[in-house]
Amino acid sequence: MFKRRYVTLLPLFVLLAACSSKPKPTETDTTTGTPSGGFLLEPQHNVMQMGGDFANNPNAQQFIDKMVNKHGFDRQQLQEILSQAKRLDSVLRLMDNQAPTTSVKPPSGPNGAWLRYRKKFITPDNVQNGVVFWNQYEDALNRAWQVYGVPPEIIVGIIGVETRWGRVMGKTRILDALATLSFNYPRRAEYFSGELETFLLMARDEQDDPLNLKGSFAGAMGYGQFMPSSYKQYAVDFSGDGHINLWDPVDAIGSVANYFKAHGWVKGDQVAVMANGQAPGLPNGFKTKYSISQLAAAGLTPQQPLGNHQQASLLRLDVGTGYQYWYGLPNFYTITRYNHSTHYAMAVWQLGQAVALARVQ
């Protein structure tokens, strides 16, 4: 739920094999004995090592105390693991770039911002890759639709925008990212300390080596880029193998669908409807809420029936030559629970629609 990246296209089976950030054990793998309350580590990570980038960091020491007292972690092993974590200045810089700013003035008129954003995701090659993903995991997508009520195009749209259907899941060690942000980023240290706590619990429960798992610079994981807290609340074992693996596309499909259901997705309902007319005098955005009669009084009419909806948010998209207005319905708002952005939600929806259309052509 962070990041935007682009790569050249390769055959799907090559890409999915290459990008997996959760190594699979083989018959020749050996693991060391696991102390009570500890992790199942690979031999190269089971070292008697003290020091490291966070050795004298009081926040790190307080975190270790909490994990031992609250969750029963093995203190020595946890110290050894954190001593192998790296402080990543690049992560701190990227987070600063994500910070909200009030110094940039909004454009005085339309400049095509929506079109530029849309072109990052909705391209012929990307749509075709979405078709391949949908076809490969059609059974899981249809099952998620039946179980959670979320249609395949929404799940495909989310995974496409987040990771190009698994092609770009991040190359940063999650432990490094979350430790850096927990111990050296005061502005959001409390939040990321909670994410690190949940990440280590996940690794212990799933018997993963926490030093092996990779994701985004902010610690987002797998096909759907779940943060550890989202894993804890919404991730599911959709493949039925007894493990929750966000780097497994089937588990990711079920987890994304469960996330949407939990955030109010209404099965079979509309997402948004384009409007005729302009309403420059009304505040816009996915957080707004107007009665349909208010929008009509402002000069807007829906291009398609709105069903039984009596209220909508007013969405405005900058298309360069002017503004495009939309009625945002509750399912549109649900998409924004994944990423709080009108552009993001519209890109997810339209990408999924484009892939669905391409499958039948």
From Swiss-Prot:
Keywords: Cell outer membrane, Cell wall biogenesis/degradation, Lipoprotein, Lyase, Membrane, Palmitate, Signal. A lipid is attached at residue 19 (N-palmitoyl cysteine). Gene3D superfamilies: 1.10.530.10, Bacterial muramidase. Its main location: membrane. Pfam families: SLT_2. The active site is at residue 162. GO terms for biological process: cell wall organization; peptidoglycan catabolic process. Its EC number is 4.2.2.n1. InterPro entries: Lysozyme-like_dom_sf, Lytic_transglycosylase_MltB, MltB-like, SLT_2. It comes from the Bacteria. It catalyses: Exolytic cleavage of the (1->4)-beta-glycosidic linkage between N-acetylmuramic acid (MurNAc) and N-acetylglucosamine (GlcNAc) residues in peptidoglycan, from either the reducing or the non-reducing ends of the peptidoglycan chains, with concomitant formation of a 1,6-anhydrobond in the MurNAc residue. GO terms for cellular component: cell outer membrane; outer membrane-bounded periplasmic space. It is found in: Cell outer membrane. A lipid is attached at residue 19 (S-diacylglycerol cysteine). Coiled coil: none annotated. Monomer. Murein-degrading enzyme. Catalyzes the cleavage of the glycosidic bonds between N-acetylmuramic acid and N-acetylglucosamine residues in peptidoglycan. May play a role in recycling of muropeptides during cell elongation and/or cell division. This is Membrane-bound lytic murein transglycosylase B. It comes from Escherichia coli (strain K12). The lineage of its organism: Bacteria, Pseudomonadati, Pseudomonadota, Gammaproteobacteria, Enterobacterales.
